[in-house]
Design a protein with these regions (language model features):
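Hydrophobic alpha-helical transmembrane segments
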Residues: 64-84
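Interfacial helix-loop-helix junctions of multi-pass membrane proteins
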Residues: 35-36, 111-134
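Internal alpha-helical transmembrane segments of multi-pass membrane proteins
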Residues: 12, 85-108
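Membrane-interface interhelical connector segments
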Residues: 35-58
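Hydrophobic cores of alpha-helical transmembrane segments in multi-pass inner/ER membrane proteins
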Residues: 78, 136-151
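N-terminal signal-anchor transmembrane alpha helix
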Residues: 5-36
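Aromatic-anchored segments of alpha-helical transmembrane domains
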Residues: 22-26, 102-112
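Short, charged juxtamembrane terminal tails flanking transmembrane helices
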Residues: 1-5, 151-157
Length: 157
């Protein structure tokens, strides 16, 4: 266990990875749904807490959605960083790992998280939105998380 970086370094890595991926992911969601105001996209995240009434809450529920989104991304980043410490191969083969991690995150979000919320986001079964979501999660979530983890923890392990 002498190889394990200090907890502070792991937390900082997860923080940076989560913030970057969170910003890229929510920006992509807003840009891919320009037919809806950004407020509505953020409120769709808050439906996990409030159900459909999140859409009636104005900017207060949009802020709740944004904060929730970043908390989710920080959790996802913490899991990835922990896995990368356990399996250093994730740092050495970070590009392959980023594709796999983005796909895993997309699958969990599409088939577990979104269905149990009251979000009006299209279901993952529709082909183009599913492909678009998968690509977005690979590029906006998997890639930055893997890159930051490799960069901050080192790939020589």
């Amino acid at each position: 266990m002498a190889d394990v970086p200090p907890t502070r370094g792991l937390a900082r890595t997860a923080l940076y990875a989560g913030l970057l991926a969170g910003a890229l992911d929510i920006a992509a969601a807003i840009l891919q749904n320009l037919e809806h105001p950004a407020r509505v996209i953020l409120q769709s995240v808050a439906t996990g807490w409030l159900g459909a009434s999140a859409y009636e809450g104005g900017w207060s529920t949009a802020w709740l959605g944004l904060i929730s989104h970043f908390c989710i991304m920080l959790g996802i980043a913490a899991i990835y960083v922990s896995l990368a410490v356990i399996w250093p191969l994730l740092q050495r083969r970070w590009i392959v790992a980023s594709v796999a991690w983005g796909a895993v995150v997309w699958a969990v979000m599409s088939f577990v998280v979104v269905p149990i919320s009251a979000s009006t986001v299209e279901p993952a079964g529709a082909m183009w939105p599913a492909v678009q979501g998968l690509i977005t999660h690979i590029l906006a979530v998997g890639l930055p998380m893997a890159w930051i983890t490799r960069r901050m923890l080192g790939a020589d392990r």
